Amino acid sequence: MDKYTNKKLRNQVFQKFIERHVKKEQFYLIEDCNTFLSFVADKTLEKQKLYKANSCRNRFCPVCAWRKARKDALGLSLMMQYIKQEESKEFIFLTLTTPNVKAEALEDEIKHYNASFRRMSNRKIFKDVVKGYVRKLEITYNKKRDDYNPHFHVLIAVNKSYFTDKRYYINQKKWLELWRSATKDESITQVHVQKIKQNNNKE
């Protein structure tokens, strides 16, 4: 329950931002989101599983996004195992970010992110390396500065030879260069990229 309580508190912050962007009916759903939770448990009551809840299903709601992320993580894990075994691929985990923005600029920044990633993914160097990818947008809030940081987490499938073939390997410096070029923002100081281990934990 503590996890849900923490996310519900974040939902209350989210309400202030989203109210002017959605219809009244949708806002009421967001405001009421996960105020009712029904669990099933074993005889000891130690293991509990959520059975039913009144979710708003808004993609940016902290509670709904968290629950969807947990479900997606399981699906991704199974997919990765299958692709590694059947397609002989490996995976890298890429995080792309830009400087924080204020609430009023967040919507435009998300549109800019999508357009920037589209530009980067259309580059020949990207297409030569990437055999498939799953992309997720995450938005974090800095309470002290009252601003937001949207960023992409990208799971990328590559050939096993990617890590040893100098013709195709893209190092961290090159990924940064590609992202700066795509966003047209030279103020970006870092991107994060790492290989996914066989046991599905990141290095």
Residue spans of the language-model regions?
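Short microdomains enriched in Cys/His and/or Lys/Arg
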Residues: 71-104
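Core catalytic machinery and nucleic-acid-binding channels of phosphodiester-processing enzymes
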Residues: 51, 68, 86
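Conserved His + Asp/Glu catalytic blocks
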Residues: 86, 99-203
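Short metal-coordination and nucleic-acid-contact micro-motifs, chiefly zinc-binding Cys/His arrays
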Residues: 54-60
